[in-house]
Amino acid sequence: HLPKAEMMSNASTVFEQSLKRCALVAILRGITPAESLPVARALCDAGFGLLEVPLNSPEPLQSISAIAHAHPQALVGAGTVLRVEQVHAVHAAGGRLVVSPNFNAEVVRAAVALDMVCLPGVMTPTEAFAALDAGAHGLKLFPAEAISPAMVKAMRAVLPKTAKVLAVGGVTPQNMGAYMAAGIDGFGMG
């Protein structure tokens, strides 16, 4: 494990290491602040290192703050981040992860400037390259159920080999293997 100070300063390293250990982002959809700590403890104990609280959950910034402070070894942050102001609010709450259903260059640049890992939602090679050019640490292929493993394989053939691609939306235990064989690095589940 990294020292706490180093973990707090290099979110991208924590992202890479967490994704290698457990290729799943736990999406804590609808979680309340009261539920957040016991759920996060169970997930971290089970090996999860990437925890996302969607901003459309009840009082998400309180949950993010509680989880981030209780589990500094984990990369904790928000999903459904659509605007720059939300990036700043997540950062102020202690979050270091920004996940979006779409690609917004301003959101990516704001997150990167704050040393936060940013995973914007993309569906096409054009969006994927634009997101990477803006500084995204990885790509959220969303909704994955609308994109076949064959399309994922074609996209991976042209994307940089180092680009991390996560499938989110409609992912099931039954289709994970096909997506991984096509080049997916991880999944968002929740």
Regions found by a protein language model. Give the residues of each.
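Conserved N-terminal beta1-alpha1 strand-loop-helix module at the mouth
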Residues: 7-96, 103, 113, 173-174, ...
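Glycine/Thr-rich beta-alpha phosphate-binding loop at enzyme active sites
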Residues: 48-53, 91-93, 114, 124-153
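Short acidic active-site motifs
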Residues: 63, 85-86, 106-107, 126-128, ...
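Hydrophobic, well-structured mid-protein blocks that either form specific transmembrane helices
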Residues: 87-127, 131
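Glycine-rich phosphate-binding active-site loops on the catalytic face of alpha/beta enzymes
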Residues: 101-107, 140-148, 184-190
